[in-house]
Amino acid sequence: MKRKILSIAFGLVVVPSAIMAQTAATEHTIRANEAVKTELDFNDRQDFEDASRGFIATVNTSAIMTEDGKESYSLEGWDFLKNDVPETANPSLWRQSQLNRFNGLFEVIPDKLYQVRGFDIANMTFIRSDHGWIIIDVTTTNAAAKAGYDLIKKHVADLPVEGVIFTHPHGDHYGGIAAIREGSSKKDFEIIAPKGFMASAQNENVLAGVAMTRRATYMYGLQLEPSVTGNLGCGLGQAMSTGSKGIARPTIEIETTGEKHTIDGVEMEFVYVLDRKSVV
């Protein structure tokens, strides 16, 4: 009996991936999408100027690859977004995905603050310290984190990591930590995170792992291929990178708002927002 139940459960998981491909937009969908065009000012291109501002460089490959040669994150897979919005897509989501498609290394504040975007659903932010880099969030996987760190070392400065900040315990903010440590000449840098970080990461990814995975399947459209009738992106970003990932125990835990720490000459003041983005 158990074997039959498992087979049925497996079928319920697999079958949707075979029937997810969509056909042409219905008349209702076309009318709804056309209505959006009248509600928003699509002639305003300021966001595109903002998204491209400070661009330095990106990788010269069609995808971010893992160490064993597998695709971690496709870059050219979203090239269909270069075209005008089709009838099958909500114009606002299409535009947002076009903005999210910008990828590579960007200068935010000259000689002080840089970001790597579009290699994962999460960004990596690099703060220039006295002797190296302080990194805010390290993406979901080692492949994406390595690509980002390599990019700033190549185009700005090849410096060690002096500190890493995990803003909260969702995997896209800490998963690439091993690649950062491996790529840095300094291995014993500080890792700053909210109080209760490890317990929360365990609760969400182990104890609630099955439910979180199910939610992510809907949330990220994991069974849809990128296309005009499939996955257009997640809104927040295009997609999560795939491949090996890890976690590291924080060396400093933030417990109160206003708490200050100085890392390699950079004083940082933290805001503790319990139970907001995640458990901590």
Predicted regions located by residue number:
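Bacterial N-terminal signal peptides that target proteins for export
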Residues: 1-9
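Bacterial N-terminal signal peptides
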Residues: 9-17
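N-terminal pre-domain segments of enzymes
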Residues: 22-102
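Non-globular, low-confidence helical/coil segments that flank catalytic cores
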Residues: 36, 40, 47, 51-56, ...
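Short, acidic/polar N-cap/turn motifs at the starts of alpha helices
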Residues: 60-62, 103-104, 124, 251, ...
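Conserved beta-strand hairpin/beta-sheet module of binuclear metal-dependent hydrolase folds
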Residues: 98-159, 278-280
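Metallo-beta-lactamase
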Residues: 107-108, 157, 192, 197-274
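Active-site metal-binding motif and surrounding structural segment of the metallo-beta-lactamase
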Residues: 131-132, 142-192
